[in-house]
Amino acid sequence: MATLHLMVGLPGSGKTTEAKKLEIEYQALRLTPDEWHLYLFGNDFYNDEAKDYEHNERHSKIEKLMWDIAEKSLLLGVDVILDFGCWTKIERDDFRLKAHSLGVKFKIHYMNCSLETIWERLKERNQDSKNTTVFYISKESMVEWNNVFEVPTEEELTQL
């Protein structure tokens, strides 16, 4: 039976690194929106709410398209890794319900990482001028996102 693997955590917490390992371990289809977004639209993220509307709209469309691909793959018996972040319990519950409605297993992979460690990783990523695989993220954006992020409960992590 296929499994929907959901990567949960903030940018810089290690989601994509772990997702790449799981992709090999489970011979799964890994869907990482940032990779598609950068390929299709380049780096159009400005860390400015007023300027980032189009970026956010494009990102949402990519995630919807990825879900369509994930759904078809799961029905074919292929494990899928959604590397979306899923910052809120409502988002995670939605994917759990979708998995159950398809008759597949569901697993959350939570990247529990301190804000200090995340910021150190992001600073390094942000300074790499050759890095075209990730978006530049400001400390202000990171602090704001950390305030929005809902840490999964133990019950949520063990619930199938």
Predicted regions mapped to residue ranges:
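Conserved GTP-binding G-domain of TRAFAC-class P-loop NTPases and closely related GTPase folds
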Residues: 2-4, 13, 17, 21, ...
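Conserved substrate/cofactor phosphate-moiety recognition/catalytic segment
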Residues: 17-78
